[in-house]
Amino acid sequence: MMAAVGAPEVISQLESAAKVLMAPPSMVSTEQRQHAEHIFLSFRKSKSPFAVCKHILETSKVDYVLFQAATAIMEAVVREWILLEKNSIESLRTFLLTYVLQRPNLQKYVREQILLAVAVIVKRGSLDKSINCKSIFLEVSQLISSGNPTVQTLACSILTALLSEFSSSNKTSNIGLSMEFHGSCKRIFQEDDLRQIFMLTMEVLQEFSRRENLNAQMSCVFQRYLALANQVLSWNFLPPNLGRHYIAMFEATPNVMLKPTESWRESLLDHRVMDLFFTVHRKIREDSDMAQDSLQCLAQLASMQGPIFPDESAQVTYLAHLVEGLLNMINGIEIEDSEAVGISNIISNLISTFSRSVLTALPNVLFASFINCLTLLTCSFGRSAALEEVLDKDDMVYMEAYDKLLESWLTLVQEDEHFPRGCFVQPAVQVFNSYIQCHLAAPDGTRNLTANGVASHEEEEINELQEDDRELFSDQLASIGMLGRIAADHCIPLLTGLLEDRVTRLHGQLQRHQQHLMAAADPDTVDRKVLDDLYEDIHWLILVSGYLLADVPQGETPLIPSEVMEYSIKHSTEVDINTTLQLLGSPGEKATSIPGCNRTDSVIRLLSAVLRTSEVESRATRASLTQLLSPQMGKDIVWFLRRWAKTYLLVDEKLYGQISMPLSTAFGADTEGAQWIVGYLLEKVINNLSVWSSEPELANDTVELLVTLVEKRERANIVVQCENWWSLAKQFASRSPPLHMLSSTVQRTLMKALVLGGFAHMDSDTKQQYWAEVLHPLQQRFLNLINQENFAQICQEVAVKQEIVATLEALCGIAEATQIDNVASLFSFLMDFLSSCIGLMEVYRNSPETVNLIIEVFVEVAHKQICYLGETKSMKLYEVCLTLLQVYSKNNLGRKRLDVAAEEDQYQDLLLIMELLTNLLSKEFIDFSDTDEVLRGQEQSSGAGRAVSAADVVLYGVNIVLPLMSQDLLKFPSLCNQYYKLITFICEIFPEKIPQLPEELFKSLMCSLELGMTSMSSEISQLCLEALSPLAEQCAKTQEKDTPLFIATRHFLKLVFDMLVLQKHNTEMTVAAGEALYTLVCLHQAEYSELVETLLSNQRDALIYQRLADAFNNLTASSTPPTMDRKQKVAFLKSLEEFVANVGGLLCVK
């Protein structure tokens, strides 16, 4: 098109098209816009547009047209590179640079695009060495030394364009070259040219740092070069050997550590570089934008690691200089708000990057100064963070900085054995004291005080909006708890004293308020300010105590922290055990009123202070002062007691090398102390559930404490000996108030606890009586209700529905209580209910919440029990699940969900159905039933007459689910994940069933797999790839050609081939895709050869053709001809790694 007309006509056409594209949508039609876009596209594709583009750049006044001309040059240069003379390319580059130099008022986006074209020319030239960056750097160097700020800014733009173009695939221009090409360029660039840019930048910063006064324009130039230095120091260096992580290395990772190659030693290990950045920061620190860049540069220097250091002594020298510079910078300045995060990043990087041996090799005085500085900074940032909270600031810079420093402390003290003994004790004391002070009210603390010491009264509104402190500040509390252990000698007595004091004051306050109320005063006239301050103090003291005394690791038996154990052992000779037990057993007494209270174990005394808090709360409820209490304090108490009980109650001496006598005597197995405290905790639970039933979070924390008391058999054995346990069970079973008012989730957990308790050690009569009182009433009431003749008429009444929902929740709770040794009895009990539940599906078909809850009962039973069930019982469960699915299917047949809310409902029930099917399938993976004596004795195998298999149920379920899965529903991530997990499982476990599916269902399944592979997240794509191998193996087994599955796998061969060879994909998927490709190649060898031939025949570049041909030959050399053999498959996957590394980027273009 463009060749047929002259330059003026081209310009006229382009300017008209630009006018259309720039016009508001209402002014032009879609067709006009598409036509305009087409004009620009064909212009950019035109052959050798260089002369026209030059003419456009020199004559057109339309910015968008100039931008497009620059883009056309950039694309054409790469496209026609081998046809162009070296001189032509050089003159084109010179023209573009001169053009920009001569037009300082160009629009920024036009200038950036022209410079990008220059960068692309340089990049393309760097590969065949026809152009190198040296001449560019010479020109840039001259521009910099011109002293003209505009010209210097342009020089910076040129360097930035080069840096962006070479840095990573994310920022690389889309110029139709292979990823391998981009990678090679980056590696060449980072060895020499990147360093050259860094040196030029250093010269500018050096020059500017010497100047006394900078005007606005000069400051602007300075800022640009500082940002450029930051870009260089944040460069993600490609390692020399790529291996299979080749492509992944292209993807920019957040928080890139500085890992330069050896060639950078001279540049970066020179102390003057680091000194310059410290000097620069001192100069510009009051400008918040520039300060962020200079601190980020220093943070990157603090993260430096890798081959740049010849040995450890070089690291020590470097680190020592860095620490000295940092201390000099911080000492003697008042830190600005904008510096806090940057400084904390430097410290955080330094502590996480350098090994302990390097840190400890620092001169003693320097290391001590650093730890001292870190201590002061942490305390200072903590105070400022507290102030930010009072003022409710949006930008919590000090909180972010404080979190970082506390994280750094955690890193240090967790490895404190590498450091001089006791070197962290004093710093830990200071940081701990500071934290406590910031969280206590005046006069002891500074909580809610503004900078000038005035109290803020907006606390309540702020707190209402926040999530729970123990979640919100869990990382901070973990660090403070750890520091508290390091300095246990100071911190445990401190917490104890403060908590005892607050509880005594709280007790006094509540007594005064009681007298005030008895004088018939209106409760609203009570001034709560003092009370609220006390509650908030107690809240933080209990949280810190909980984190100091115990960890709660996931899935492990929590142990008493070694520092706490050692502290208790160290002081055990000064402890009177009897007085300690008296203190523990007297929560109603003030600790100081007990003679010899100072000769008690401090760890137990801290627990006693919490029990005392709990006792004051309980007494206040008995005195009808509940309205004066804080539910938050109630939550804190049971949270603490649960955390404590998991670790200390019935402490197992076998798990410890040495044990503290006071702890063992007070809480060990078969001790009076343990029995007393179990009784006390149970009493607390019962009291809470009756007083606080309307506070769902507090009630939930309370029943979780109850579960902790019975989940371990040893603890449960003590619990069931308590009379009030039995009365709690009876009360709940009879749905007596106030327990029936608890929220459904709390009722579910309470049921779980009561069932777990039933498996404690009891004689058979007692056990029978227990079940008769806990489970029998539930069954009776349910059957009486649903067997009423008029149930269909009354089923929607509120009271009836509540009863049904409560029963379903209880059934979920019973299922959740399943353990290997109780599954036999629980399964029989639950099975009686499941058939009745299916009847309820019919009754409540128009009530989605109830239907979901019914399905959830099945989900829980399958999830918790299927892995323990033998064959006969599994069959029963499959049959009842199949019936459930049939009823669900009948009720949903042809049902259209029109509104969004309905789709949400459908989303929930579909999710539950798929969860149920996945749980049933899990039997194939996890099956403990063979080793289960409980079940084996009761079952006879009925292999020959199997009525229903898991496959039947699951495939029937998929038949229901597939037609209901719309594209819109797949946008819900949880639904999408569950769906693909399910269909992958099916293909892996029952591949032989797939060819037997009805035609429509088979097609839907194949379409789903293709959609998942090509249009979903990498996680879903991987699941679908994993589904292909078993399907291909199934085809190979049957050796039937032209079946629908055989044809489908042939289609998948092309998809997987393209994914591995032609598309950019996540390296983690290479293995899954490779396994799929191998099995598909075994099945369709001729088609695979055809794909390779077609690909090779399209290669015009002889070099690429040869490399590809060799790579494909090597790929299959180890397995010719390929067969479904594990050894061959492993060899193929190994070859595939090399194949992807060598040609993975060759055909994948950008």
Curated annotation (Swiss-Prot):
Principal subcellular localisation of the protein: cytoplasm
Signal peptide: none
UniProt similarity note: Belongs to the exportin family.
Name the UniProt record assigns to this protein: Exportin-4
The keyword Magnesium appears for this protein: no
Gene for this chain: xpo4
Entry keywords, A to Z: Cytoplasm, Nucleus, Protein transport, Transport
UniProt-recorded Gene Ontology molecular function terms: nuclear export signal receptor activity
One annotated GO biological process: protein export from nucleus
UniProt keyword annotation of Cytoplasm present: yes
InterPro entries: ARM-like (IPR011989), ARM-type_fold (IPR016024), XPO1_C_dom (IPR014877), XPO4/7-like (IPR044189)
Function noted in UniProt: Mediates the nuclear export of proteins (cargos) with broad substrate specificity.
Pfam families xrefs: CRM1_C (PF08767)
Cystines in this chain: none
Domain of life: Eukaryota
